[in-house]
Amino acid sequence: MKRNIYVFAGESYMVRESFARLKASLDIQMEELNVTVFSEMPPADQLIETCAAVPFLSPVRLVAVRDCTALTAAGDKDEAKKIADYLERLPDTTVLALCVAEAPDKRRTLYKRAAELGTVREFPEPNPAGCVSFVAEQAKKQGARIGRVAAQLLVDLVGCDYYALANEVAKLAVYTGGREITAEDIN
């Protein structure tokens, strides 16, 4: 049976967006008491203690580690093993999200156990063709349109950085006021 365990790994923008979508999909009340986000890897005992806490006036609590080095080769193996051993006992009322902005080490016990019990989403580093598609998707989200040539020009100028591309598309969408974004707007 799948548990409430999520691993988001790889390209940082996609990891952050996936985490944000997960958080938005949960029915969390009193968020300040039922959401704990560690910016870096806490000691295993602290993470386990946080996960074991009962949600307060909410059906679920969210515990997340933004830079889960325990999933990488650089992480502490003993700490990772403690967490891996705990995953099977994770309460049904706790959602655990382990995020890392690089490729995880699939040989790690923690990765294997999380993949077995939960959901793993890996996001490879973007390629230029993927970035052009990303620009088109972002324009659509902003209520704008952009042609393939203009999208390619934007990728050529900005580079294949999802954060920078999303920011530039948002600015262009405001600038164009709903009309199609053209190469002239970008230059």
Sequence positions of predicted segments:
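Conserved beta/loop motifs at nucleotide-recognition and modification sites
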Residues: 1-187
